[in-house]
Amino acid sequence: MINVLAVAGLPGSGKTTVARIIERRGYLYYSLGDVVRAEAERRGLTPDKTAVTMRLERGRKAVIYELLKSVKPGEKVVIDGIRSIEEVEALEEFLGTVFLIYVVASRKVRYQRLTGRGRSDDPLSFSQFLLRDLRELRFGLADLLSRADYIIVNETKSIEELEQEIGKVLLELR
């Protein structure tokens, strides 16, 4: 059985929704975005600047190393917001085999989701949205698509449809 599930995808793709469904199936939930937002608050910076700064200061694995301080080997965990192959490798190094789920949705759908979410780090304009996508892709997010063990196309799926799909995936992992 695989105990470590990682969820990746561009902002607004539905990563957190997928990860929270997995959490309800008995996995402990951890968010790399929460790590960045907490560090941003501590530093007095925006989450976007903090994500870049952490990686510039301590390398591409900086955020995952911070998160790993809270995770115990052997726990069933879902990690929300993986950004690079290096982060997956760090998880594998400390926790064992990782099953990577990549969530995709169109630019239009993702922008609509983000502007309706109400989080402080959501884009205020379409140009900000595009810049955020570029930043995320520079972290190595696109490279994860070829490493994905499972891809969810989350364009128009209801929560119930996502729950059914994820349930089937988790059954196969047993």
Curated annotation (Swiss-Prot):
ATP binds at residues 9-16. Disulfide bonds: none annotated. InterPro entries: NTP_hydrolase-rel, P-loop_NTPase. Pfam families: AAA_17 (PF13207). Keywords: ATP-binding, Nucleotide-binding. GO terms for molecular function: ATP binding. Coiled coil: none annotated. HAMAP family: UPF0200. PANTHER family: DEPHOSPHO-COA KINASE, UPF0200 PROTEIN MJ1399. Belongs to the UPF0200 family. This is UPF0200 protein PAE1629. It comes from Pyrobaculum aerophilum (strain ATCC 51768 / DSM 7523 / JCM 9630 / CIP 104966 / NBRC 100827 / IM2).
